Amino acid sequence: MPKTSYAWHELTLTLSTNTDPTSAQFALTNAANSVYEKYRKEIDHQHAVLERVMDTAFPKPQPGTKWQFTDAGLELVLRYPVVIEHAEEIDDQMTREVMRVVATNSQLKASLSGTPKLRAAIRA
């Protein structure tokens, strides 16, 4: 979209099925929000430009989570907007904060199955 330069990225974590989804979601959403707060104003500005150009109101971009079942277990998808010019830095900060939360939360750490994955979110 002209005059906007943000996209969506996802960080996925596979957790065992005995994970408490509510506490895991709460902890990881808080982690994402703490990183997002550092660049939220830039996303909000671009969002406002998009609304003016399109002459339509859209929900403000913000981090969110969803659960899905996979063959490997229960997958938590943490989706967040990134400023394209700073996407690598934002992904690094997001990964570090999520891993810090996992490392300091014994239940979450014990339920982590496999390696977290980072990807650009492309939706049809």
Residue ranges and their predicted role:
Residues T19, T29-A124:
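Solvent-exposed, non-transmembrane regulatory segments of membrane-associated proteins
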Residues M1-K41:
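A membrane-cytosol interface segment of integral membrane proteins
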